[in-house]
Amino acid sequence: MMLLLPFLLGLLGPGSYLFISGDCQEVATVMVKFQVTEEVPSGTVIGKLSQELRVEERRGKAGDAFQILQLPQALPVQMNSEDGLLSTSSRLDREKLCRQEDPCLVSFDVLATGASALIHVEIQVLDINDHQPQFPKDEQELEISESASLHTRIPLDRALDQDTGPNSLYSYSLSPSEHFALDVIVGPDETKHAELVVVKELDRELHSYFDLVLTAYDNGNPPKSGISVVKVNVLDSNDNSPVFAESSLALEIPEDTVPGTLLINLTATDPDQGPNGEVEFFFGKHVSPEVMNTFGIDAKTGQIILRQALDYEKNPAYEVDVQARDLGPNSIPGHCKVLIKVLDVNDNAPSILITWASQTSLVSEDLPRDSFIALVSANDLDSGNNGLVHCWLNQELGHFRLKRTNGNTYMLLTNATLDREQWPIYTLTVFAQDQGPQPLSAEKELQIQVSDVNDNAPVFEKSRYEVSTWENNPPSLHLITLKAHDADLGSNGKVSYRIKDSPVSHLVIIDFETGEVTAQRSLDYEQMAGFEFQVIAEDRGQPQLASSISVWVSLLDANDNAPEVIQPVLSEGKATLSVLVNASTGHLLLPIENPSGMDPAGTGIPPKATHSPWSFLLLTIVARDADSGANGELFYSIQSGNDAHLFFLSPSLGQLFINVTNASSLIGSQWDLGIVVEDQGSPSLQTQVSLKVVFVTSVDHLRDSAHEPGVLSTPALALICLAVLLAIFGLLLALFVSICRTERKDNRAYNCREAESSYRHQPKRPQKHIQKADIHLVPVLRAHENETDEVRPSHKDTSKETLMEAGWDSCLQAPFHLTPTLYRTLRNQGNQGELAESQEVLQDTFNFLFNHPRQRNASRENLNLPESPPAVRQPLLRPLKVPGSPIARATGDQDKEEAPQSPPASSATLRRQRNFNGKVSPRGESGPHQILRSLVRLSVAAFAERNPVEEPAGDSPPVQQISQLLSLLHQGQFQPKPNHRGNKYLAKPGGSSRGTIPDTEGLVGLKPSGQAEPDLEEGPPSPEEDLSVKRLLEEELSSLLDPNTGLALDKLSPPDPAWMARLSLPLTTNYRDNLSSPDATTSEEPRTFQTFGKTVGPGPELSPTGTRLASTFVSEMSSLLEMLLGQHTVPVEAASAALRRLSVCGRTLSLDLATSGASASEAQGRKKAAESRLGCGRNL
């Protein structure tokens, strides 16, 4: 109910309010107010209670959602019990319902069963201006003497208006007159009446009468009025008229005043003498008949007496007009208004009205506390304290209480839970008493019947049942009958029985109606000595209630089990016991079955002292009997085979002894003993055992046991299993470690700057501090087609002979600077030891450097290096052609006709295979010839790094192309693009198409990092493209070193930026192997890279001074082009400075050539001095 409180507070309309007592938790008292205007037609809707409370309408359901508990008889209102719709049943007349009461409120109570609330409905009937003011008579006649003085007042009849508020009587008005005026007087009770006032002297001779119109009007919209004609007759002069001591009086009398009681004595005086001074009293002409019947006046004395009983409830006030006149002629009466108020007295006893919530006095016993039972209304017709009623209950148990809701209305609530089984009928007495000085009371007796609910579970007669029975009972044996009682009525009190499911519930069964328990099967004491099950008793009410009880069944043991021998172990009722005998002494040893030296019975006592000093314990027979008590007590005896009384068997313990001190004579003999084990039951059961006792010596025993197969013990088996598991675990661990330590080789091109930066930010690797001054990134010379390993030996001999014939063999012996690429080439070509050991190796290295094919990056493939260097291949050297030239078109057409050939799958390098159908270089061509062509190719690669301002002529010889490159550098028109990719050279994306420059097919196109390398078709060079090395050296050497060499700019063709030299050998995963110290000097000692300390082997021997020109030229040109391809972007001024250094280096070369007759050390010293001053060599 506490949950209903906020619901009701939030759902009531603005005209409603809720109050609820703190001790009432089941029924809320709600007050709902409605307003309706009077005179509405029948059937007009006043309000809907379901909308006010927002409860669901119970259409089509049993019972009513709303019920009127008390309705005034005069109120024409009806209610729909389903949704609480209030409407008028007939015409509403506020004046009839409330008379002059304002506001007009009528109330009644409604019980909302859906919301568990008592609704106090209060309907305010609003007044409309449906009545006009009315005078008692339409015409009133007055008499006045012509000698009346000014300001004489004559009371006029008061008009009545049944409406209230603004619609009631508002004021009066008088038609215009020069002799009379109107004065409106407001009485103590807010009533208004008019008085006629003389404002001008009267003259009967001029005006004998006056006709005036008195109008009374209200303040309604529109206002209504009523008129009365006042006729004033002017009489001859009578000097004086009677005058009352007070013109108006108010009198209060109790309503219980006895008729005939004098209420007031009025007095009036007239100063005249004789008849003109005698005064008589009478009621005015316009006094109502009700007043005339209720009151009377004595004409002589002026006493007003009560003629009949008063009733405050009918008329609480009376207004009386009393007049007094003398007995003279033309008498003028005097007027006096007397207001008589009736005082209410406690003359009405309270009346008690009971309205049941369920239309009957039958209540359910499962009602919770503070449940609503009935509405008690105490009515008292008296007013004030006389009408205030207090009610209370007179009861024995205190299960009910009354709670005031509003006024004299109470709710009858439950004060405790009800119990039909103890009190099926409750008798209550309701007392009501008002609050008057002499209180009046009333009483009413109530009888409340309690209906039964299923609130009692069945109860067994005992809290636990126990029963005993013999085992091996027949099925359907009666065990016990259970009985449970239920105090409820009808089906709520009918009890049924069942057994709760359990492991033993299948052993018994119970009758559903009677509760008789029987056994379903034969019971066995040896399986269970007793069992317990639960019986559930349930009634048939809703909801169903149940109770349970435990029943213990004890089984009595019967001797139904024979003894069972456990030791010795029997085989078909037989057992064998071997006893060891010392053949020399005849002493008995332990039985074979008991090698531990302890008592066979397990007592821990040595066998010697068990029975007697001369006896020996052979065996303890262990038997058991599943029966209990005497049925399980066992007796042991030897039945047969002991005729010589050699053995003794303990009857109670089952210990078998032998009575002998020297058993030498028993060796080899055997005894068959018949042993009987018998219980003490009735009848007794027994078991027979055949025991064979054999006496043997220790030698015989050992001989027999040698033939028995060996059996591994449990600890040995455990150790073997543990060893196997550890071995398996070790193998798995070794396999796991070997897999985890497998290195993933990444032989991609290395960038020292990026590697150093990324290496520092890897927290799982140690920091490798690399000094930038100690390392220098050099370009790698690359070759072309794949060569097989099988042609390598023939190439060695051929290249050497060709080199000697051309006069260049001395060049290979000259000391020159090895680039890291050349050094790795020498190191990786088959474990060669010394450079001076074989000049052919160096020559083969150069050939391999420029002719080795480029393959796919093997960082994610299996890297299988060739066991021997591939065969020599003539490097591809093609002059640049102008786009559209005949040579370019012929070559392009030839390339289109040739189909590419796939390289051998067995070749493994860091670059992927290229499809190239090239020709093998002629044997007559020397190594320097190939080196020069490679340098030309590197120069064109440098042009591919930019959009050239000036382009070298495509038909110029190779050395002239290098000269043109240097001239562009000198003029500041070429700035090499910086390279940050180590041994890879970036090129401008979007190279020329094959149709434009077809002679660049033999070179590798560059690609951005992370992109796939495009496959380019490669074609063989044309014969006319081969150049003579001698002609190159004779005609163009001077122009190579001359900074003022002119360029044929008009013949330049755009280079193809999509190619560069191929990598000659695969790179290693160790970045140290891809770097070199550029400042390392040549020495005859074994050479070592200063940065990483890797020993290569002995260097080449110094060549004669006359042959150093070609070696120096190759070294300086290699250093120059390394700088061009690997340096960062420099301004034009830096390029000019580099060219000036190159000129000095050229003069250094000339100096070396001029001083060929000097010693090698002197020439080398002068050269290094010049280089150190201007930064020649690798510092260029």
Curated annotation (Swiss-Prot):
<dbReference type="GO" id="GO:0016339">
    <property type="term" value="P:calcium-dependent cell-cell adhesion via plasma membrane cell adhesion molecules"/>
</dbReference>
<feature type="domain" description="Cadherin 2">
    <location>
        <begin position="136"/>
        <end position="244"/>
    </location>
</feature>
<dbReference type="GO" id="GO:0005886">
    <property type="term" value="C:plasma membrane"/>
</dbReference>
<dbReference type="InterPro" id="IPR020894">
    <property type="entry name" value="Cadherin_CS"/>
</dbReference>
<feature type="topological domain" description="Cytoplasmic">
    <location>
        <begin position="738"/>
        <end position="1180"/>
    </location>
</feature>
<keyword id="KW-0732">Signal</keyword>
<feature type="domain" description="Cadherin 6">
    <location>
        <begin position="600"/>
        <end position="711"/>
    </location>
</feature>
<feature type="compositionally biased region" description="Acidic residues">
    <location>
        <begin position="1014"/>
        <end position="1026"/>
    </location>
</feature>
<dbReference type="InterPro" id="IPR050174">
    <property type="entry name" value="Protocadherin/Cadherin-CA"/>
</dbReference>
<dbReference type="GO" id="GO:0005977">
    <property type="term" value="P:glycogen metabolic process"/>
</dbReference>
<feature type="transmembrane region" description="Helical">
    <location>
        <begin position="717"/>
        <end position="737"/>
    </location>
</feature>
<feature type="domain" description="Cadherin 5">
    <location>
        <begin position="461"/>
        <end position="565"/>
    </location>
</feature>
<feature type="glycosylation site" description="N-linked (GlcNAc...) asparagine">
    <location>
        <position position="265"/>
    </location>
</feature>
<dbReference type="GO" id="GO:0007156">
    <property type="term" value="P:homophilic cell adhesion via plasma membrane adhesion molecules"/>
</dbReference>
<feature type="modified residue" description="Phosphoserine">
    <location>
        <position position="859"/>
    </location>
</feature>
<keyword id="KW-0964">Secreted</keyword>
<dbReference type="InterPro" id="IPR015919">
    <property type="entry name" value="Cadherin-like_sf"/>
</dbReference>
<keyword id="KW-0472">Membrane</keyword>
<feature type="modified residue" description="Phosphoserine">
    <location>
        <position position="1064"/>
    </location>
</feature>
<feature type="region of interest" description="Disordered">
    <location>
        <begin position="973"/>
        <end position="1026"/>
    </location>
</feature>
<feature type="topological domain" description="Extracellular">
    <location>
        <begin position="18"/>
        <end position="716"/>
    </location>
</feature>
<feature type="region of interest" description="Disordered">
    <location>
        <begin position="1156"/>
        <end position="1180"/>
    </location>
</feature>
<feature type="compositionally biased region" description="Polar residues">
    <location>
        <begin position="1076"/>
        <end position="1093"/>
    </location>
</feature>
<dbReference type="InterPro" id="IPR013164">
    <property type="entry name" value="Cadherin_N"/>
</dbReference>
<keyword id="KW-0106">Calcium</keyword>
<dbReference type="Pfam" id="PF00028">
    <property type="entry name" value="Cadherin"/>
</dbReference>
<keyword id="KW-0812">Transmembrane</keyword>
<feature type="glycosylation site" description="N-linked (GlcNAc...) asparagine">
    <location>
        <position position="659"/>
    </location>
</feature>
<comment type="function">
    <text>Cellular adhesion molecule that may play an important role in cell-cell interactions at interendothelial junctions. Acts as a regulator of cell migration, probably via increasing cell-cell adhesion. Promotes homotypic calcium-dependent aggregation and adhesion and clusters at intercellular junctions. Unable to bind to catenins, weakly associates with the cytoskeleton.</text>
</comment>
<feature type="domain" description="Cadherin 1">
    <location>
        <begin position="28"/>
        <end position="135"/>
    </location>
</feature>
<feature type="region of interest" description="Disordered">
    <location>
        <begin position="1076"/>
        <end position="1104"/>
    </location>
</feature>
<feature type="glycosylation site" description="N-linked (GlcNAc...) asparagine">
    <location>
        <position position="582"/>
    </location>
</feature>
<feature type="domain" description="Cadherin 4">
    <location>
        <begin position="355"/>
        <end position="460"/>
    </location>
</feature>
<dbReference type="GO" id="GO:0005509">
    <property type="term" value="F:calcium ion binding"/>
</dbReference>
<dbReference type="GO" id="GO:0060711">
    <property type="term" value="P:labyrinthine layer development"/>
</dbReference>
<keyword id="KW-0597">Phosphoprotein</keyword>
<keyword id="KW-0130">Cell adhesion</keyword>
<feature type="signal peptide">
    <location>
        <begin position="1"/>
        <end position="17"/>
    </location>
</feature>
<feature type="domain" description="Cadherin 3">
    <location>
        <begin position="245"/>
        <end position="352"/>
    </location>
</feature>
<keyword id="KW-0325">Glycoprotein</keyword>
<feature type="glycosylation site" description="N-linked (GlcNAc...) asparagine">
    <location>
        <position position="662"/>
    </location>
</feature>
<dbReference type="GO" id="GO:0005911">
    <property type="term" value="C:cell-cell junction"/>
</dbReference>
